[in-house]
Amino acid sequence: LPDTTPRMPRVDAGPVYELRIYAAAEDRLGHLIKRFRDHTDRLFRKHKMEPVAYWLPTDGTAKEKRRFVYILKHPSRYAAYQNWNAFTHDPEWKRGVLEKPEFQRLLSERPESVFLSPQDIPGTFPHSTNPSIFELRTTTVANGKLPDLQAHHRQHTTRLQLKHGMSPRGSWFAYDKPESENTMVTLL
């Protein structure tokens, strides 16, 4: 049936990005990576979720290094809801993946999920098979100062990053309030 439920226009606007952070249980990170390589990535694509980047922390405590971080692109915030609903109800996911013993009890805590709105600061995600180091930066400013931060980033920061050999991969604002009023996320 067609979806005729009235919604706020904002939830149909897009694209939106979703930053997800998984904390793997001890001795389970390898199995989590295998699940993504063998099943999850393909099922994301099947359900209209576009993987933008996957990475692992290189520093921090042993627990912090067991995190698995990724970004998905969705056509809209509402589409993200629909995509996740279809994904979690997919018979291949429920019976073909989650029932395998090697893929059970992979996480030590509930996944973190932050929706992000793109901004007009250049950034690219060129596909590369070369190992790379990425830096995820979250900048929080006083309420009302986010446009100033964006302007400074666009006019100065990006140029300086490129001058010093850093490659901006993307910049986003938090989608949901209250963070959307003062938070910018950047991937270098």
List each model region and its residues.
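Short S/T/G/P-rich N-terminal loop/turn motif that feeds into the first structured element of a domain
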Residues: L1-R95, P101-L188
